[in-house]
């Protein structure tokens, strides 16, 4: 899980979701998991 100021989709499988006011990227590749904060 990467915590970044700006989250971007890294591949076509990355999905951008908002959970409890926190933007997250979920993907089939664990390396691509990110959250904004």
Swiss-Prot record:
Instruction: List, alphabetically, the InterPro entries matched.
Output: Ribosomal_bL36, Ribosomal_bL36_sp
UniProt record, GO biological process: translation
Asked whether the keyword Ribosomal protein is assigned, the reply is yes
Which source organism?
Mycoplasmopsis pulmonis (strain UAB CTIP) (Mycoplasma pulmonis)
What gene does this protein come from? rpmJ
List keywords of the entry alphabetically.
Answer: Ribonucleoprotein, Ribosomal protein
Which one of the record's GO molecular function terms can you name? structural constituent of ribosome
- GO CC terms: cytoplasm; ribonucleoprotein complex; ribosome
Similarity comment text for this entry:
Belongs to the bacterial ribosomal protein bL36 family.
Source domain of life is Bacteria
Matching entries from HAMAP family are given as: Ribosomal_bL36
Q: What is this protein called?
A: Large ribosomal subunit protein bL36
**PROSITE patterns in UniProt:** RIBOSOMAL_L36 (PS00828)
Q: Show the taxonomic lineage.
A: Bacteria, Bacillati, Mycoplasmatota, Mycoplasmoidales, Metamycoplasmataceae
């Amino acid at each position: 899980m990467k915590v970044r100021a700006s989250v971007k989709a890294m591949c076509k499988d990355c999905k951008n979701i908002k959970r409890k006011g926190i933007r997250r990227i979920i993907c089939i590749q664990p390396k691509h998991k990110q959250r904004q904060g």
